[in-house]
Amino acid sequence: MTFTPGGFERSKVLLLGMKYNCSWVIQEMGEYPRTVDVFGHEMLSMKWILKNAPSVVLKEHELQEYNKKMSHVFWDLNTWNEFYKRENIKFAFGTRFHGNMEALRNGVPALWITHDSCTAELTDFLHLPKITIKEFSTIKCLDELLEYCDYTELRKNYYDLCKNYVDYLTENKLAHKYNLTYESGE
């Protein structure tokens, strides 16, 4: 699970991850919950929660435990790839484009939750499975997300996407090792 901090709707992604004890892949330090020391006890910063995850405000202690047990930060792709294999991750979802791409690169089905125009445009162009943040607000359980995870359009368009990429590299005289041959997926 990935989530982009900020706003009530986006923080519902974090809530669903917490509900199902999903691994939380943190992709930038701004996503990492801030803590404060209160009389010798480390606690989550209420300021961080209100700004970044307001729908979790009444679950502060749950979030603190979830963060300790389930959050992961990767500094290199090899470690991230090993994590997917070691933890036997079966499904990824969230608002972070690159987090879902890394899951997909590792053979893990992923569902993008589009919360901005950039993510929507990228998922449209690549024909990736997605739901809008508004659609996500109606989701009650993880199984409902799986219903949206359809790769039919990506499979249909994969060759053309690859050809477009290789043509770009060739046209711009960028060295590559790609040699495309068309194989019908039908």
Each model region followed by its residue ranges:
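Active-site anion-handling motifs in enzyme catalytic cores
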Residues: 1-186
